[in-house]
Regions:
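Hydrophobic alpha-helical signal peptides and transmembrane signal-/tail-anchor segments
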Residues: 1-11, 16-18
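Accessory alpha-helical DNA-binding modules that contact the DNA backbone or grooves
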Residues: 57-58, 73-140, 145-171, 515-643, ...
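Duplex nucleic acid-engaging cores and interfaces of nucleic-acid transaction enzymes
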Residues: 60, 76-79, 86, 90-343, ...
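Structured, non-catalytic alpha/beta "coupling" segments that mediate domain-domain communication
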Residues: 100, 114, 251-264, 274-299, ...
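Long, charge-rich intrinsically disordered scaffolds of nucleic-acid metabolism proteins
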Residues: 123, 435, 441-442, 446-516, ...
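S1/OB-fold single-stranded RNA-binding interface
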Residues: 125-129, 138-139, 143, 153-155, ...
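A glycine-rich phosphate-binding loop feature that marks nucleotide/adenosyl-phosphate handling sites
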Residues: 200-207, 344-348, 402-404, 427, ...
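Short boundary/loop segments of OB/S1/cold-shock single-stranded nucleic-acid-binding domains
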Residues: 327-332, 641-661, 695-698
């Protein structure tokens, strides 16, 4: 009995040991592959994977674990995470493939070795293809008819073989030869060498071609006109830009064009011939027919689908990269800060919705003014505006950039200039800055669940105006409440992989929020949700605790929040600020785990002696962390964003009809893509600076610049620009 028990314990421990050994070997293999692919040290990769598996976030690893990762930045860590996810999925797929082949009784040691060593999903699927369950094919039917021996005989291509005589043994020669060719065709198509040969030819010579679909209704034909530059595309696939490929695919989805991707057929068949044709015998002729059929019916469609998918994937990745870069710039847009703001959501027929906000963004007052046609209550609008400016001590004005924006801006500036010239008890500071603010996303917020939660008793127009005002005060705090896809800085965002787009944009928002940091005593739950390690549940708990117990006096008090365990605190503490708390370090990016060394550095700094950071290096704290701490001590509670600057459009233009070629106008960059930058000149239609006009210059989202009008296509409502003096 004792021996049996000992054996059972030993056996179970052996299984655990083997499984752990297997897991560790997989991790080591994955680290090695990622290291080669990304050109990073294997120890760096192992450290990142280990930290990710421990539950650490990318912002936390990048900022607070530099010694372990060799100071890898967020992009490098994110790349490791993405590669690790792919390779872990590949490992899971390998196990499925191995199990399936083993069930069939066809798993040899050599086949297992090839699968285990495989590092690419395409290669793995090629290995698996002959064993993969599939619906019955022409070749399957031929095998069931007993024609496999005939196919094998033909493949030998013996010059002495009389093909028709051999075929007659199995039935009617024409039918049996066709069946044998079907078997050979499938065999060729499933052969790794064949597939790789055709892939190489596609990689070198594949062309993407489009053909216009002309049988359209009048309305559909009008819609199709927007895609006319894609009606007769004939370009090398490897050279086509991502935005053109996505536009072509959208035109295909809309039913305006047919798309074909094909390589040089003659060269592809020549490559296959080198693999499968050995002489000029009659049997070789049968194999050649099967080979051509295999290419046209099986190989080309399969490889075309592969290249269509891979090219789309690359285009998606590039579009998502551009979107994420634009989003990052938008989230880091310069804030006005905590000032009292009057915000206007402009309009003609329904008037302009006016709201006044406190320095904390609370709604104090709202009204509607109608200074424009068709209502034309200008005097009343002026009175309401002046009273609101006076009563709420307004320090800045935000005007949405939608319909009637220019007219509303002109009205406001005129009122400010003339206010103190009129006999009135309301003395207004005519130098109150006026800002035109993007409305993108404001209407989405106003109708959203978040908007309803924040202002349950107000209608959508009030919520929209509040969003415009708050966006001026702190773009980051307001934009996190809006789905990034609604902000309007994407490129073909509805055409790309939606899951990958969401992952990338969420990662971007998380990165920016943690880069800036948030005041835990004032931040909304929506902003707190993106803090490293927090999430929606803990964010709500922080807000609830704050409401019940008042402001947090220090970071340690966060541990009293429900579900704020030690791990969550470790991940989030450095990114949460406490202004005016009991410990000045709580208002910096210094992590509580490094307060002791920060205190020693501060003491050395205050001594007036020269401080050598190298003298403070220890086993736990290296030079990179010490440099970060020193920067925080040098500029505590700093905001990495700059102060917003006032901007004015030209008074000479209000619509595309006012434009002339050669005009120089002030503008704001509203969107950046691979093919150029879009610029708002205050005429409700953005112009395009084509990438060829930038000449290596890099523009930033919402950058102020002067542009020159190159050309105007009024029929298509398009404006071409270039940077002035370029």
């Amino acid at each position: 009995m004792f021996l049996l028990l000992f054996f059972c314990i030993f056996a179970s421990k052996t299984v655990i040991f083997v499984s752990k050994f297997s897991y560790l070997s997989v991790i080591m293999n994955i680290s090695s592959v990622i290291s080669r692919r990304l050109g990073l040290g294997e120890k760096q990769v192992q450290a990142v994977i280990g930290l990710l598996h421990e539950g650490a976030t990318i912002p936390f690893i990048a900022r607070y674990r530099k010694e372990r990762t060799g100071s890898l930045d967020e992009l490098q860590i994110a790349a490791i995470e993405a590669e690790n996810t792919k390779l872990e999925e590949l490992e899971r797929r390998k196990q499925t493939v191995l199990a399936t082949i083993e069930e069939q009784g066809q798993l040899t040691p050599e086949l297992r070795r090839r699968i285990d060593e495989c590092e690419d999903s395409v290669e793995l699927e090629d290995i698996y293809l002959p064993y993969k369950p599939h619906r019955k094919t022409r070749a399957d039917k031929a095998r069931e008819a007993g024609l496999q021996p005939l196919a094998d005989l033909l493949l030998k291509q013996d010059p002495r073989t009389d093909c028709r005589r051999e075929a007659q043994r199995y039935g009617k020669p024409d039918e049996t030869l066709q069946g044998a060719r079907d078997i050979i065709a499938e065999q060729i198509s499933m052969d790794e060498r064949s597939r790789n040969a055709v892939r190489r030819e596609f990689a070198y010579t594949a062309m993407i071609r489009t053909k216009e679909i002309k049988q359209l209704t009048a309305q559909r034909a009008q819609e199709a006109a927007n895609y006319r530059e894609y009606f007769a595309v004939d370009e090398p696939l490897k050279r086509i830009s991502s935005h053109r490929l996505l536009a072509i695919r959208r035109a295909e989805t809309e039913g305006f064009v047919r798309v074909d991707i094909s390589c040089d057929q003659e060269k592809a068949l020549d490559k296959l011939a080198r693999l499968w044709l050995h002489n000029n015998s009659n049997a070789a002729y049968e194999v050649e027919q099967a080979m051509e059929d295999s290419y046209k019916r099986l190989l080309k469609p399969a490889i075309e689908t592969e290249f269509a998918a891979s090219s789309k994937q690359k285009a998606d990745a590039e579009a998502i990269r551009v979107f994420a870069a634009n989003l990052r710039q938008l989230l880091l847009e310069n804030p006005l800060g905590q000032k009292r703001v009057l915000a206007l959501d402009p309009g003609f027929r329904t008037g302009c919705k006016l709201v006044c906000l406190s320095a904390q963004g609370d709604l104090l007052y709202h009204s509607v003014i109608c200074p424009h046609p068709p209502v034309n209550k200008r005097a009343e609008a002026e009175t309401i505006l002046l009273k609101a400016l006076h009563d709420y001590c307004i320090e800045a004005i935000a005007i949405g950039n939608g319909t009637a924006s220019r007219e509303t801006e002109a009205f406001v500036r005129e009122v400010l200039q003339s206010s103190n010239q009129k006999s009135s008890n309301l003395q207004i500071n005519e130098t109150i800055p006026v800002f035109v603010v993007s409305e993108n996303g404001a209407s989405v917020y106003s109708a959203s669940k978040i908007g309803r939660e924040e202002f349950p008793d107000e209608d959508v127009t009030v919520r929209g105006a509040v969003s415009i005002g708050r966006r001026l005060m702190d773009p980051l705090a307001e934009l996190v409440k809006i789905d990034p896809k609604s902000i309007g800085v994407g490129q073909y965002q509805h055409d790309v992989d939606q899951a990958e787009l969401k992952r990338s944009l969420d990662q971007t928002v998380e990165s920016v929020v943690n880069y800036v940091g948030v005041d835990v005593n004032t931040a909304s739950k929506h902003l707190l949700t993106y803090i490293s390690g927090v999430g929606p549940v803990v964010a709500q708990n922080i807000v609830n605790y704050r409401a019940e117990h008042g402001s947090f006096p220090d970071r340690r008090a966060l541990l009293n929040v429900p579900k704020m365990g030690a791990k969550t605190f470790e991940q989030c503490a450095g990114f949460l600020r406490i202004a005016g708390g009991t410990n000045p370090l709580d208002n910096t990016a210094v992590h509580p785990e490094r307060y002791a060394v920060a205190a020693r550095l501060q003491q050395a700094k205050m001594s007036g002696r020269e401080v050598r950071l190298e003298d403070f290096v220890s086993e736990e704290v290296g030079l990179p962390t010490l440099q970060d701490i020193w920067r925080e001590l040098d500029k505590p509670s700093r905001d990495p964003r700059n102060q917003i600057e006032e901007f004015r459009f030209s008074e000479a233009v209000h619509s595309i009809d006012d434009l002339q070629e050669g005009m120089s106008l002030p503008g704001i960059v509203t969107n950046i893509s691979n093919f150029g930058a879009f610029v708002d000149m205050g005429i409700h239609k953005d112009g395009l600076i084509h990438v060829s006009q930038l000449r290596g210059k890099t523009l930033a989202l919402h950058q102020h610049l002067t542009v020159e009008v190159l050309s105007i296509d009024r029929e298509r409502n398009r404006i071409s620009l270039k940077p002035a003096n370029s």
